[in-house]
């Protein structure tokens, strides 16, 4: 059975490609999702994408993935620094996840340096631009057995 990956993008990532392109680049979220799906399929995995600007919707989607998804790639956007609810949802479903950020959050404003997810993530990808999505998808698809053993 193919590995199943859920790609979650948080608030304002629907503006990818047009919002602050000097920081986030010019590739759109639709382009990222299509490329991520194609890459997952080339590795024998399936990928479903979800984006929301609403914390509760993200929590609901994570909970709905329980027992149906093998790994999550999440770019929580601004919720990285504020959302205990999303953190608790990820821990509650027990699905290994990769935390992803397009920009290098550690080279930006000090308040962006803290993440509610990093200490529980199976891996963290920051500052690689949208290429980070490819890296994250590949890691989940190829190294799932290692992710499965992640101490969550």
From Swiss-Prot:
Which residues does the annotation list for site: Transition state stabilizer?
19
- One MF term in the entry's GO annotations: 3-dehydroquinate dehydratase activity
**Do you know which CDD domains this protein is assigned to?**
DHQase_II
The EC code for this enzyme is 4.2.1.10
Which residues participate in substrate binding?
Answer: 75, 81, 88, 102-103, 112
User: Which cysteine residues pair off into disulfide bonds?
Assistant: none
Pathway it belongs to? Aromatic compound metabolism; 3,4-dihydroxybenzoate biosynthesis; 3,4-dihydroxybenzoate from 3-dehydroquinate: step 1/2
One biological process term in Gene Ontology: quinate catabolic process
Q: Which UniProt keywords apply?
A: Lyase, Quinate metabolism
Q: Which PROSITE patterns did the record assign?
A: DEHYDROQUINASE_II (PS01029)
State the active site.
24 (proton acceptor), 101 (proton donor)
In its keyword annotation, does this UniProt entry include Lyase? yes
Entry keyword Transport: no
Catalytic reaction annotation: 3-dehydroquinate = 3-dehydroshikimate + H2O
- List, alphabetically, the InterPro entries matched: DHquinase_II, DHquinase_II_CS, DHquinase_II_sf
Purpose = Is involved in the catabolism of quinate. Allows the utilization of quinate as carbon source via the beta-ketoadipate pathway.
Put simply, this protein is called: Catabolic 3-dehydroquinase 1
Q: Which organism is it from?
A: Aspergillus terreus (strain NIH 2624 / FGSC A1156)
